[in-house]
Structures are given as structure tokens and as C-alpha cells.
Amino acid sequence: INQDWNYETTQFALNATAVFELTHAVLPGMIRRKTGAICNVGSAAGNIPIPNNATYVLTKAGVNAFTEALHYELKNTGVSCTLLAPGPVRDAVIPENEKSIVDKVVPDVLWTTYESCAKETLEAMAKNRRRVVPGPLSKAMNVVSSVAPTRVLSPVMGWFYKKMS
């Protein structure tokens, strides 16, 4: 509600418009050559209505649905499309004086490393998997969002995201 409009529109352009335009730019050539792989970065957060993070959720829900739909549309074309839905990703160890508010709010055990995220993603792409969810937090969010009622989950996630802002 009280978000910076410029920040929100920039976030939309980066998270949604750029994904759509870049996919559109490379896909025709891949289909013509009958080979290629697309990996779009969505989020487990795109599966849950999260107060205090509405624009992010909007963009990631769109990327999730767009990418997973393309995965099926591209069957038998030689082109694969995988959704990467990571949780928080960073270096394994961060000095205390360099930690952001997110680093301080999200416990270390819930982060995944760049290397681990990349390895899981490349393995999933090689197997033409529809979705890859690296990291403990995103795996948990993925499961919880499929079983917990929205009326319970959304307020909890909204509180958590508000702590990070």
C-alpha cells in the first residue's frame, strides 16, 4: 500500500517484463534449430499471497506460471524450459558486519550457496525438469504452500516479509 511506485515498477520490469521479452527474443531461434534450454527464475513466494510483498509475488507468480506452461508447450521441439524457484542464495559464510537485514532475519541454515543452487539447476535442466527448488527454505515453502490454508499462511508470510523491510 505504501510502496515506492518507482521501485515497484522497476521490480515489475526486471522480474516479469524482462523474463517475457528475453524468452521471446531467444525462443524462435531455439525452436528453428530444434535445440536449446531456457531457465527462468521464479520463486516459491510466487505460490503464496504475501502481504507487504505484493509486487514481488505478482511477478514471481507470473514467471512461475509462464515458465511451467512453456515447459509443456515446448514438448517435442528439442527446447527445454525449467523454472528455478530458489529460496535465499548467498555465499556460505558472510562476515557479521556485511550482513543485510535479510541475512540477519533468515537463519544461516535456511540459505543455499550459489554453487549448490547452480549445480541443482544445471542437473534439473539436463533432465528437462519442469521445476527445480534448491535450498531448504524454498523446499519448505513449496511444500507448505501446497498444504497450508492461505488464510493461515499469508498472514505469517506477511509478518515475516515485513520484518525484512
What are these regions (language model features)?
Residues T23, T59:
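Active-site helix of classical SDR
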Residues S43:
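Residue(s) in the substrate-gating loop at a strand-loop-helix junction
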Residues I1-T9:
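Substrate-binding pocket helix/loop in short-chain dehydrogenase/reductase
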Residues A25-K34:
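A short helix-coil junction within the Rossmann-fold of NAD(P)-dependent oxidoreductases
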Residues P28, Y72-E73:
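Alpha-helical segment proximal to the catalytic Tyr-Lys
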Residues E73-P136:
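SDR active-site lid
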Residues I50-A54:
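Active-site loop immediately N-terminal to the catalytic Tyr-X3-Lys motif
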